[in-house]
Structures are given as C-alpha cells and as structure tokens.
Amino acid sequence: MCGIVGYIGTEQAAPIILDGLSKLEYRGYDSAGMAIFDGEKINTRKAVGRLKVLENLTHGGENMKGTSGIGHTRWATHGAPSDINSHPHMNNAGTIAVVHNGIIENYIPLKKKMQDKGYQFVSETDTEVLAHLLDYYYKGNPLEAITKVLHRVEGSYALGIMFADQPDKIFAARKDSPLIVGKSDNGSFIASDVPAILKYTRTVYYVDNQEVVELQQGSLRFFSVDEEEIEKQPVTIDWDANAAEKAGYEHFMLKEIYEQPKTINDTISPRIKDNDIVIEELNMSDEEIKEITKIHIVACGSAYHTGVTAKYVIEGLARIPVEVDVASEFRYRDPILQKGNMVIVISQSGETADTLAALRESRERGFKVLGIVNVVGSSIAREADSVMYTWAGPEIAVATTKAYSAQLTALYMLAMKFARVRGTIDQEKFAGMLTDLRCLPDQIELLLGQKEKIQHFANRYVGARDIFFIGRGIDYAISLEGSLKLKEISYIHSEAYAAGELKHGTISLIEDGTLVVALATQPDLFQKTISNMVEVKARGAFVMAVTIEGNKAIEKASDYVIYTPETNPYFTNSLAIIPLQLFSYYVAVGRGCDVDKPRNLAKSVTVE
C-alpha cells in the first residue's frame, strides 16, 4: 500500500526514483510525486493518476536535476486523490520534504496545535503534520528533530525526509510500515520493497521498528528513536531483477499463474528427505507437537482462504481443532488462547498490518507464533517465533496466485507432519499422500494446457452482472478464493457460499442466465453438491462445474464441466483453483481491466 523510493549519490536522482516507483506499482496507488534537491532548493512535482503522468510531467525525470531526492506513490487514506494531497509534503518555507506510508492516528490534535502556532496547512492529509512538526523542532540537527517528532506521533509510518540545508544527506524512519535501505558504489537508497532498488544493488538493510537512518552517498548510519547509534548487518538478495519482469507474458498475473508448478515444487523439495517431511524451521520437538491442543490460524484475504482449507486438512489428518480468524477481527474479539494452543499467521508480504498486529498480540500473551510468509526478512519473518518460507519468488500482480498455491502447499506439509508425529495417519497413507503431493506440479501443468478452452468460456461472461460460487467442505474454501479472484480483477459482483446455505436466502438471487460455479472435488460430498446444482439450474442458472476426472454423474446437473486430475481429496484446492484463476484472468482481460493493478487495491496492505 503506497510506495517510497529515495536516492542520494553520484547519479541523477529523478530517473532512478521514477524507475524504482515503477517497480512498486503493484502495491496500489492513485497518485505520485517526487522531491529533488537541485543544489539550491527542493523542487517538487506531483500528479494524480498512473506513474506515467508524473513521468510525462517531468520528461522521465530529465527536467528535475539533482543527485538526491525522495519519491512516493500514494494510496489515499486521508483526503481524496489530488495533486495537493499527493506526496511529498513540505513545510511552509519549502525547506523540508516528507514522504510517508502509514497512518498518523493522532494527527488531528497535532494539526490543531501546529495551526495554533501559525503553521498553514494546504492538504487534507495526516502526513502534512509531519512536515510542520519537523520544521518546529529543527534547529540544525536533523536527527534530533526527527526523533522528537517520532516521540510525539502515534500510529504507523515509513518515512523519507529531506532538509534543504543538508544537501549531502537524506533520512528514513520506520514504525509498523515496511522500509529497507540499500547501498551501492554509486549511492544509497530508500525503498518500501526490494524490487524498487534491485536493479542498482543487492545489498540491503531491513529497517526495524522505531529506527532512523541517515543516508549519504557512501554511508548508512542507523539510530534508535533515542538517538543511540545501532550496528546492523546487510542482507544479500539472492534473486535477480528478471524474476520481477513479465518475461514475454501479457501480464504478471498470467506469468505467475504459469509459475505455480515451479513454486509448489520449490516449496516441497527442501522439506522432503528420505520419504519423510522435515520442517527444520518449525523449531518444535515431537513432544511439543503432540501437546498441541488447538491451532489458531490468522490471516487476511486469500491467505485467510488458505487457512480455511487448512482447517479441514489439519482437523481431518492430525485431529487438532482449528479456528480460523480474519486478522482484523482476531485481536479485537479477545480470543481465548489457552495452554497448548498454537498460533499460525499467514501473509505473502510478511507486512500485512492486521496480521502483524495479531502476531504481536499473541506473543504479548505468551504464545508461540509460526509465520508462513514469502518475503525473507519481512516483519512477520523477523518477529514470529518460527518461520516457514514459501519460496514463491517475487509476486508482482496484486491478485495473488502462486503465493496462494505455495501457502496451501506449506499448510498441507504442516498437517501431514503433525499427523505423522501424533500417529493419526499410518505410514501407508502418509506415503500415498506424499506421492500425491509430489504429483501436483505436473498435474497443474496439465490443467494449464486447457487455457484456450477456459478462455473461450470466459469470453461468454465478460458482460456478466453477478456470478456465484458454491461448494461444500474444502470446496467451499476453493469457492471463497475463486470468487475473490474474479471480483478483485474483473469488478464483477461475485459471492461464494457454502452450497447447503443457498436455500436459506441466497437462492432468491438466482435468475435466468446467472452463472453459478459449482466446486465438486470431494467424493463424499458429490451427491449433496449435485442436489444444490440441480436447485439453481431449475431456477434458470447456467452451471459451470469443476470436479475430478471420472465424476461423469455431474454432467447431467451442469452446462459446462472442467475436470481436474485425481488427487488426494485434501489436495484438490491446488488443482481446482487453476481453472478459476484462468477464468477470472480472461474475464478481466475481456473487460479491459488493469489485471495487474486493480482499482482501489494494494498488494501489501500495511495499514489497519
């Protein structure tokens, strides 16, 4: 959510900042801006709309000369998208510039105090109060001014700051919003995420909570909010910039759909040894696993949907009760956590604000937390007691595909590990499931071969008004994700329902021609699901079914059927989701939607 890029060095800053911001477009934004120091003063340019507008306004940065600057893509929280509300924000004298991700929760009383002191506000944002506070406290010592401001503000922030009378320095600070800094032979960098600066350096430092960084051309210095200097170790990024490029695909989303076989294999391979599942990073003894009395899974969006699937899989295999919570609800409902409970948080970015808050709440109450994340060094990865990385590589499209599949795979392996240790499945069943797990990448390749068939069908529903997804058990979990994929990238109203709930109200919405996507991958629920399909078909619905090979009985209750390869019933989500991802993608493309960057959405939701 929003993006920050900063640079100070020997090169022209504006083109580097624009390039970096372009690598952060996946985070979601509605406007963009830059501040560049030209040797005498700080110049700013802002523009509502796509980054291209700012690029055109500045001729690719060529008409903003200077070797230090900060840039920002804004996702509106306080104040509508506008040039005035766009970042950077300045003090009244134009000598201090600030870019900010996050929310200053006490900005209203702070704003009033600054207005009472004569400061003039021009925007509706919470960020502008930072610029005026910095001006108020600045007496020639930037670090002192920044730390005084940080002691007064409440909320979350990632900051990039410039002072006109400090031409050889820029500053960064962080609390509860992601931020990294990096260094190369040609300068130093600030960024919200690695892809923004990977073209220029592989050496990065993760800024921790309530830390301030002073960046100069050849050096980085780290400080606490109490101005104590901190020693930090760099991290070398081991994937290259090409992994974050389209590689010939029309969209990142399509590329990432096709990367799922590799993603699943990369998640599985390091954790299978001698026909057993070994999760060394779990840091739990067999005795500790046996003592688990309940698991709480906490996540948001698609990650929450993987948690819903995991509930069925873990309860079915390991016989451990599982509760799944939307992260934004978890911490506010005063959850009952008892001895023997385990908390699992799931997040692709490792920076999801609500999930991070749930992690901290759980740890404060004395419970160990396992994080399932994709981004190495992210906040959740650093703060969780143990971490399972999904090794999906960079996922650029806002709508998750391969990270979702990797999360599912990690959860399958966790469930199987727990079941084997607790003795709730025998060796024969475990070995069979391990074989099925290893087959998933090849089976997904087969499903991807049906692309043209699915595209042809999707083109028929480009103009749909409503689409419903139904399923039972694990199929309900698949329905949740299929519906979310469709609505977030095509803007078609879509809902997912437990199939048995249709008759309790939702069936009144079915009319002639309404598309109902029915998931039927669970053999013990086939007949019940078919009954629900017949009910909607009798009311004029067009029924698209997704089921496993051999389930020919479903054809009489369907108008269109997609068959997936046969696998263990607990793993069907990984296969059934593929045609739903492709269907959503081609509907969105047919409607002319911005598939990789849907309106109003952000890849990493870093505010609560």
Where are these regions (language model features)?
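Conserved short alpha-helical segments that host acidic/polar catalytic motifs at enzyme active sites
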Residues: 1-246, 250, 262-294, 332, ...
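Hydrophobic alpha-helical scaffolding
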Residues: 7-10, 100, 120, 135-139, ...
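Glycine-rich phosphate-binding loops that contact phosphosugars or nucleotide phosphates
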Residues: 290-432, 436-439, 519-563, 583
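Generic C-terminus detector
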Residues: 227, 542, 555-557, 567-608
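Active-site phosphate/pyrophosphate-binding segments
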Residues: 260-264, 268-296, 386-515, 588-608
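Structural motif
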Residues: 68, 96, 294-296, 342, ...
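Glycine-rich oxoanion-binding loops at beta->alpha junctions
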Residues: 67, 71-84, 273-286, 310-346, ...
